[in-house]
């Protein structure tokens, strides 16, 4: 297993739709292992392949943060097939360190995805899991959470990022 560096905004790989996963093999399993290790190292609960510079429709999630291996989720070529309700909570992102903003998301979602063997399955998520599904699938579509907030807030966030870049803190 290898810890891979997290790509930061404005890297182009974060802003374009990822390519579908077509090969389900040991290389994919190794990538998933690397993604979990990289996510844990960065203290995250979710990580999409574009966040480590790989344009593939693949994401990993672990709300237990290593406490319960049964809660590790791998979503390959995921899509949201049902949304219900509304929640407005603060989000952060490993590709946008130190940036946190409130984002409107569906309260409940159903995701359809493939597992490591290429088999399709459906999974429901509520509250934080629903938010994680939506946040990570957005990454696969080239959308960062700062593009789900108001233009005014986004402008303030982008100014803050530019200031950190000029100061060498980004």
UniProtKB/Swiss-Prot annotation:
Which EC number applies? 3.5.1.88
Q: In the record's cofactor note, how is the cofactor described as bound?
A: Binds 1 Fe(2+) ion.
* Reaction catalysis annotation: N-terminal N-formyl-L-methionyl-[peptide] + H2O = N-terminal L-methionyl-[peptide] + formate
Main EC class the enzyme belongs to = hydrolase
Keywords on this record?
Hydrolase, Iron, Metal-binding, Protein biosynthesis
One Pfam match, given by its short name, reads Pep_deformylase
The organism sits in which domain of life? Bacteria
Record-level Gene Ontology MF annotations: metal ion binding; peptide deformylase activity
Active site, per annotation:
136
> Which biological processes are named by the entry's GO terms?
co-translational protein modification; translation
Q: Which cofactor does it need?
A: Fe(2+)
Residues annotated as signal peptide: none
Residues annotated as binding Fe cation are: 93, 135, 139
Q: Which SUPFAM superfamilies match?
A: Peptide deformylase
Similarity comment text for this entry: Belongs to the polypeptide deformylase family.
What is the role of this chain? Removes the formyl group from the N-terminal Met of newly synthesized proteins. Requires at least a dipeptide for an efficient rate of reaction. N-terminal L-methionine is a prerequisite for activity but the enzyme has broad specificity at other positions.
This chain belongs to the protein called Peptide deformylase
């Amino acid at each position: 297993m290898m810890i891979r560096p997290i790509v930061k905004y404005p890297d182009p790989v974060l802003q374009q739709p990822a390519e579908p996963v077509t090969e389900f093999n040991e290389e994919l399993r190794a990538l998933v292992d690397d993604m979990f290790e990289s996510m844990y190292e960065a203290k995250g609960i979710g990580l999409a392949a574009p966040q480590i510079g790989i344009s593939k429709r693949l994401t990993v999630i672990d709300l237990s943060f290593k406490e319960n291996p049964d809660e590790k989720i791998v979503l390959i070529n995921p899509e949201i097939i049902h949304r219900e309700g509304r929640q407005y909570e603060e989000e952060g992102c490993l590709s946008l360190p130190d940036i946190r903003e409130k984002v409107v998301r569906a309260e409940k979602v159903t995701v359809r995805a493939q597992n490591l063997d290429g088999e399709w399955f459906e999974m429901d998520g509520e509250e934080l899991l629903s938010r994680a599904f939506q946040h990570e699938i957005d990454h696969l579509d080239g959308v960062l959470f700062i593009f789900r907030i108001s233009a005014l807030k986004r402008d303030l966030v982008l100014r803050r990022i530019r200031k950190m870049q000029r100061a060498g803190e980004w």
